[in-house]
């Protein structure tokens, strides 16, 4: 029996990154030997065991054979004669097909070290094309390591295109698509994930609402980058700098979906694209089974992002109504989330990346003023039933009006 550290732990250690999870491959053993040594078996489809002390995963070396469609259509074979090289060959990328023995020596049968040095994401073998999930995984790795200068090898991107055109991605379940997307949204450069999907044709298959934005022009005066698809990825990049929250990043990604519905004869203007985009947000989220909280914020951002940008022109009643519409009284975090997504929208434009965004500050300040109006004082004043709500709203409007007069500049 020989045990090797494999995969991401080896890769990230070589890149000088922190290692979170460690996976091990066991060569020359059997399930019974593992059980006799005190390991606990957890894998149903193939033998995976938990170490009795560390609870890290130890998998018997195995090979895989395509036996059906999609990413689940594989038959696994494991036996003591399966070699380490056999096991590593089934992995997706060469940089993930590295192993380390107990002496610290790196085993590299597929030139993963060379590709690490050259910052290349390259598939190990043609078997890559048998698993459509790998298209998303490579896009996610490209996003995860973009800051280190990684790029996808030309032959791997070509294979990803062939897989997409062959309809392989249609076998992916919504849950797996969302899981990979959610992971990509946590990376430093989530926009790279969607750009890679577009480069291989997968964006049109998995995110048609986003793909439809490319080639749709916006007024050059407000959007020097012109293309709405490019603007969308720029805003996502900016959102990633402003917030680590997946819901903020996803909502930013979806903020302009309504522009994809504008008839070409009306370009480059997109009047009413915010409310129009709400249905597309709902459509996308329902298809991918996006969690409700993330979906709800994306809907609100699509509907109200343009309104927040015009904050100095809003009257106090509209401002308080906005807080009502986003349910800020029960979910105050939404004010900050909308401020961040709106800022990402404004700064996600060519030449505006470092622009100040006072509207975000005013939105936050206006909220602090409105929510500081005490409900208790209204009740003690003798108001009852529905009158309490009406009087509280009136006092909030008055407070916001007073604040706005002093702090928020009047529009020209």
From Swiss-Prot:
Record-linked CDD domains: HDc, NT_ClassII-CCAase
Residue positions binding ATP: 8, 11, 91, 137, 140
Amino-acid positions noted as binding CTP in the UniProt annotation, renumbered to this chain: 8, 11, 91, 137, 140
Binding-site list for Mg(2+): 21, 23
One Pfam assignment: PolyA_pol
Keywords linked to the UniProt accession: ATP-binding, Hydrolase, Magnesium, Metal-binding, Multifunctional enzyme, Nickel, Nucleotide-binding, Nucleotidyltransferase, RNA repair, RNA-binding, Transferase, tRNA processing
SUPFAM superfamilies for the chain: Nucleotidyltransferase (SSF81301), Poly A polymerase C-terminal region-like (SSF81891)
Residues making up the signal peptide according to the UniProt record: none
A single GO BP: RNA repair
EC number, as in UniProt: 2.7.7.72, 3.1.3.-, 3.1.4.-
Cofactor: record remark: Magnesium is required for nucleotidyltransferase activity.
Cofactor needs: Mg(2+); Ni(2+)
Chemical reaction(s) catalysed: a tRNA precursor + 2 CTP + ATP = a tRNA with a 3' CCA end + 3 diphosphate; a tRNA with a 3' CCA end + 2 CTP + ATP = a tRNA with a 3' CCACCA end + 3 diphosphate
GO molecular function: ATP binding; CCA tRNA nucleotidyltransferase activity; cyclic-nucleotide phosphodiesterase activity; magnesium ion binding; phosphatase activity; tRNA binding
UniProt domain HD: residue ranges: 228-329
Further information: A single active site specifically recognizes both ATP and CTP and is responsible for their addition.
Task performed by this protein: Catalyzes the addition and repair of the essential 3'-terminal CCA sequence in tRNAs without using a nucleic acid template. Adds these three nucleotides in the order of C, C, and A to the tRNA nucleotide-73, using CTP and ATP as substrates and producing inorganic pyrophosphate. tRNA 3'-terminal CCA addition is required both for tRNA processing and repair. Also involved in tRNA surveillance by mediating tandem CCA addition to generate a CCACCA at the 3' terminus of unstable tRNAs. While stable tRNAs receive only 3'-terminal CCA, unstable tRNAs are marked with CCACCA and rapidly degraded.
Record note on domains: Comprises two domains: an N-terminal domain containing the nucleotidyltransferase activity and a C-terminal HD domain associated with both phosphodiesterase and phosphatase activities.
UniProt cross-references to HAMAP family, sorted A to Z: CCA_bact_type1, CCA_bact_type2
Subunit structure: Monomer. Can also form homodimers and oligomers.
Family per record: Belongs to the tRNA nucleotidyltransferase/poly(A) polymerase family. Bacterial CCA-adding enzyme type 1 subfamily.
Protein name per the record: Multifunctional CCA protein
Source organism per UniProt: Shigella flexneri
């Amino acid at each position: 029996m020989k045990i090797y550290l494999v995969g991401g732990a080896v890769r990230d250690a070589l890149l000088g990154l922190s290692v979170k999870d460690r996976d091990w491959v066991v060569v020359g053993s059997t399930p019974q030997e593992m059980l006799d040594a005190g390991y606990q078996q957890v894998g149903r489809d193939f033998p995976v065991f938990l170490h009795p002390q560390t609870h890290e995963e130890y998998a018997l070396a195995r090979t895989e054979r395509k036996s059906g469609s999609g990413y689940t259509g594989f038959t696994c074979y494991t036996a003591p004669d399966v070699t380490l090289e056999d096991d590593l060959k089934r992995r997706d990328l060469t940089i993930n097909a590295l192993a380390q023995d107990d002496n610290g020596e790196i085993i590299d049968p597929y030139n993963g070290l060379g590709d690490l040095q050259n910052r290349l994401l390259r598939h190990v073998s043609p078997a890559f094309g048998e698993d459509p999930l790998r298209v998303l995984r490579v896009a996610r790795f490209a996003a995860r390591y973009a800051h280190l200068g990684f790029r996808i090898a030309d032959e791997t991107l070509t294979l990803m295109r062939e897989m997409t055109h062959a309809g392989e991605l249609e076998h992916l379940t919504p849950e797996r698509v969302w899981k990979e997307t959610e992971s990509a949204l946590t990376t430093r450069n989530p926009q790279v994930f969607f750009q890679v999907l577009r480069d291989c044709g997968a964006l049109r298959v998995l995110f048609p609402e986003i793909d439809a934005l490319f080639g749709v022009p916006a007024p050059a005066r407000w959007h020097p980058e012109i293309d709405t698809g490019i603007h969308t990825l720029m805003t996502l990049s900016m959102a990633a700098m402003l917030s680590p929250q997946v819901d903020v990043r996803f909502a930013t990604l979806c903020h302009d979906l309504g522009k994809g519905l504008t008839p070409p004869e009306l370009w480059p203007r997109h009047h009413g694209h915010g409310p129009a985009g709400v249905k597309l947000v709902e459509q996308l989220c329902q298809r991918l089974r996006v969690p409700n909280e993330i979906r709800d914020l994306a809907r609100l951002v699509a509907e109200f992002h343009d309104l927040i940008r015009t904050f100095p022109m809003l009257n106090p009643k509209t401002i308080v109504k906005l807080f009502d519409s986003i349910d800020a009284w029960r979910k105050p975090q939404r004010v900050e989330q909308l401020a961040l997504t709106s800022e990402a929208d404004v700064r996600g434009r060519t030449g505006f990346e470092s622009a100040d965004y006072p509207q975000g500050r005013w939105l936050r300040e206006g909220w602090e003023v409105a929510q500081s109006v005490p409900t208790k004082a209204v009740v003690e004043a003798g108001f009852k039933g529905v009158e309490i709500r009406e009087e509280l709203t009136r006092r909030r409007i008055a407070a916001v009006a007073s604040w706005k007069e002093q702090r928020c500049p009047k529009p020209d």
